[in-house]
Regions:
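Bacterial signal peptide processing site
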Residues: 21-23
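Mature, soluble, non-transmembrane domains
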Residues: 72-202
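Positively charged n-region of N-terminal signal peptides that target proteins for export
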Residues: 1-4
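Residue-level signal for mature regions of secreted extracellular proteins and peptides
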Residues: 10-13
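Post-signal peptide N-terminal segment of mature Sec-exported envelope proteins
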Residues: 28-45
């Protein structure tokens, strides 16, 4: 049995951690549900950008849990391992959550990053999330067409080279594991993701 999994907003949900490195693993369970594991770390410069000189965390564990449960996930567990680190595990049992839709064909898992749905996530996000995402001035959320290099240059002109370099060096690592244990992985540059230039299927 094949499960086609379309990521529509999970990447946007966690984009505030992506100025460094984030890892997302999607594992198809024997019962057809999908287990999602996420770990991410906010970059130092981006953390300063959001929090200013405050030493507090930009991670609201209760709010993240609430939003994910509201999106249709089960068994949501969010842990905050410091000011900038977060780990999340959750389960999509219904196969009809806001994040995923599923289809049956043969025996592998597919991934598609869809920028239209990322924009939809932004439009439907709560005010606090939108304010954070607005700080990224990301083309994916404002509808502008821009290359990754142009976007990094824009960040540099607005926030300085340190923030721009942090985003430029950031990657999102995504792994899919089907019910037979076969694993596929892809590494996506953060700048490409935020420009909407990462519509990848594998």
């Amino acid at each position: 049995m094949r499960k086609s999994i379309f990521i529509v907003s999970i990447l946007a949900s966690f984009v505030l951690f992506f100025s460094c490195t984030a890892d997302i693993t999607l594992t198809e369970q024997k019962d057809g549900s999908v287990k999602v594991l996420f770990s991410g770390r906010a970059g130092d410069e981006f953390n300063k950008l959001i929090n200013g000189n405050n030493e507090g965390s930009l991670i609201d564990v209760k709010q993240i849990s609430y939003q994910l449960e509201k999106a249709g996930f089960y068994d949501v567990k969010v842990t905050n391992d410091g000011i900038k680190d977060v780990k999340i595990s959750m389960l999509d049992k219904s196969k009809s959550s806001y994040i995923f839709t599923s289809g049956i064909v043969s025996s592998k898992m597919d991934l598609n990053i869809n920028k239209e749905n990322l924009r939809k996530f932004y439009d439907e996000a709560d005010e606090q999330t939108r304010l954070i995402l607005d700080l990224l001035i990301a083309p994916i959320f404002n509808g502008e067409e821009m290359s990754a290099d142009e976007y990094v240059e824009l960040l540099s002109s607005v926030y300085g080279s340190a923030v721009a370099e942090e985003v430029q060096k950031g990657f999102v690592n995504i792994s899919l594991v089907n019910s037979s244990g076969k694993k596929s992985s892809v590494k996506i540059p953060v700048a490409d993701l935020l420009c909407g230039n990462a519509e990848i299927t594998f």
